[in-house]
């Protein structure tokens, strides 16, 4: 094939990809609906995870387009550069161009698979946070206020809290860890997690980081409350593992439960219950950090 044809196909591919990208971006902006009034709502359970999923879904068509046409256009460009050569040089160049094309296909495919795997993980996390929030819902009738995906900055480190409850029993932070089971490697106890007060032992191995992270978040949140409201109280940390059986062999500062056990764990009377005024004061603080849902 004449190099002019290669150049034409290459140019067409670039123009086609650019046009598709521009059209997709225009349609995405044009289809945004406008509400009758400007809402500013509290975040729902898994709100930040859902936003990430939506961002991935919005970029997926363009990702697939670039990953399919990118290696093809690049391969054509390489072959166009090799075509004017002659003899052994052309053969070697053709082989290298073919290897370059195959490498592009490989890395593009791996990139797409990673994006799809990330979306699957995020969807599992979102479902876990929804399941925990649903089990906590009855506490609202008992005077609790519930906040989801609370993000707090400016305290030395960033806090991203899945669920925060404020009620007569005090302040409780509930972190959700949703992990899928791997029945091929786990054996007969694939549904169990052991907690000895210091670490989690999953079927595939121990995990100290999760407990330490939840504990540190509770301590940091307690300090932030004291600085922001003047109310000094310990924050109770709870780690929820939806869908897992918890084998408790010890007690620690972090309560570890599944979604069915969480209600009785949170609704434990504190030594010094919070007053209605304190509940309202603390709740207003949390609202400032998770009331940003506009559409």
List where the protein language model places each region.
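Short, flexible, mixed-charge acidic loops at enzyme active sites
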Residues: 184-196
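Conserved hydrophobic "DFG−1" position in protein kinase catalytic cores
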Residues: 165-166
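Phosphate-centric recognition/catalysis
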Residues: 162
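Surface-exposed interaction regions that form or flank ligand-binding interfaces
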Residues: 1-158, 169-171, 177-185, 200-295
């Amino acid at each position: 094939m004449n190099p002019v044809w290669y150049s034409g196909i290459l140019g067409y591919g670039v123009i086609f990809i650019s046009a598709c990208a521009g059209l997709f971006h225009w349609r995405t902006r044009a289809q945004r609906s406008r509400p009758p009034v400007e809402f500013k709502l509290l975040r729902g359970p898994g709100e930040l995870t859902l936003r990430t999923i939506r961002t991935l879904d919005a970029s997926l068509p363009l990702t697939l387009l670039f990953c399919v046409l990118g290696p093809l256009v690049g391969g054509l460009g390489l072959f166009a550069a090799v075509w004017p050569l002659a003899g052994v040089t052309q053969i070697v160049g053709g082989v290298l161009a073919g290897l370059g094309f195959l490498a592009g296909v490989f890395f593009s495919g791996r990139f797409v698979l990673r994006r799809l795997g990330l979306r699957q993980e995020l969807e599992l996390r979102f479902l876990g946070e929804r399941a925990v929030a649903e089990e906590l819902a009855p506490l609202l009738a008992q005077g609790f206020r519930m906040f989801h995906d609370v993000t707090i900055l400016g305290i030395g480190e960033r806090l991203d809290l899945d669920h925060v409850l404020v009620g007569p029993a005090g302040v409780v932070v509930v972190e959700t860890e949703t992990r899928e089971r791997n029945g091929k490697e786990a054996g007969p106890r694939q549904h169990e997690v052991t907690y000895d007060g210091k670490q989690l032992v999953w079927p595939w191995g121990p995990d100290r980081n999760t407990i330490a992270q939840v504990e540190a978040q509770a301590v940091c949140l307690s300090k932030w409350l004291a600085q922001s409201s003047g109310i000094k109280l310990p924050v109770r940390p709870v780690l929820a593992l939806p869908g897992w059986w918890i084998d408790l062999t010890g007690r620690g500062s972090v309560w570890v439960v599944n979604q069915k056990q969480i209600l009785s764990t949170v609704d434990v009377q504190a030594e010094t219950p919070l007053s209605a005024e304190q509940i309202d004061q603390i709740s207003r603080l949390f609202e400032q950090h998770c009331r940003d849902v506009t559409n």
